[in-house]
Amino acid sequence: MASEREQISRKVALIALIANLILMAGKVFFGLVGDSEAVFADGIHSAADVVASIAVLAVIGISNKPPDQDHPFGHGKAEVISEAIVGIILVIVSVYILIEAILSFVKGPSVPQYSALFAALISYVAKEILYRYSIKQGKKWNSKAIIAIAYDHKGDIVASLAAFIGVLLAIIGNSRGWSYLLYADAIASAIVAYLIFKISMELIRPSVDVLMEKSVDPELIEEYKAVIFQCDQVKRIDRIRAREHGHYKLLDVRLSLDHDLTIKQGHDIAREIRNEIKRQFSDVEEVLIHVNPYFEE
């Protein structure tokens, strides 16, 4: 039976998939009918979001599987892979939109219609709601997959806002005879491309760090040390390493205890420390503790 975390993750991803399908169809249609490069480009972005949502749905079940013989540390990194996939998709989309914006400058500006303006506005409102919901659930369940979806929605928010402003300026320019404002739609497309690329980097960089097993923040290491030193028998921490493994963390600790202690006493102390760390840090999945004998110098 799926855990509550997995059920919520699937629900968020499914809502994102359905919303992106509807918004994609609407923005592509009204972008073409309403003669707006920016809204059409935003629609292509939503098409990529559909692919991203499917990718996230595919890995949610995998990431929540318990450890097995082939994957003794669990499957948490599957979420990180989905985060990287979403980031790569957004890079491709940003490049495509930028190329289309440049071509729009070359062939000359078009005059967007009000239908394109309303499509951008509806997209902005819908994505704002979806972002707030997704980021809340992502942080609550410490899910990189859901947070990736939230960042994707965030990209749509700024993209739809830029498209709305660009279309509005172009419409105003056409009605007032200010021809230079007709280029606002194409400029908005270029801005959309930049903003999407920026958000893609916010997804790719941390996912690469996790896949390369970068250490957690030094401040968090100090918090782990403070918990360990709560045990009076600990004479010294020889080494402590911690890394993210998707939605949970793994710790490797070497510490020194008095050399007169028996193996059982050392084992019991290590178990108490392990349990206390996991009690205080709910996202810590495993703590491997190696005990060294301590001699007074």
UniProtKB/Swiss-Prot annotation:
It is found in: Cell membrane. GO terms for cellular component: membrane; plasma membrane. Disruption phenotype: Deletion mutant is manganese sensitive and accumulates high levels of intracellular manganese. Effects are exacerbated in a mneP-mneS double mutant. The chain crosses the membrane at residues 12-32, 43-63, 85-105, 111-131, 155-175, 177-197. SUPFAM superfamilies: Cation efflux protein cytoplasmic domain-like (SSF160240), Cation efflux protein transmembrane domain-like (SSF161111). Induction: Transcriptionally activated by MntR in response to manganese excess. Expressed at a basal level in the absence of MntR. It is a multi-pass membrane protein. Its main location: membrane. The keyword Cytoplasm does not apply. Keywords: Cell membrane, Ion transport, Membrane, Transmembrane, Transmembrane helix, Transport. Belongs to the cation diffusion facilitator (CDF) transporter (TC 2.A.4) family. Primary efflux pump for manganese. May prevent manganese intoxication. This is Manganese efflux system protein MneP. It comes from Bacillus subtilis (strain 168). The gene is mneP.
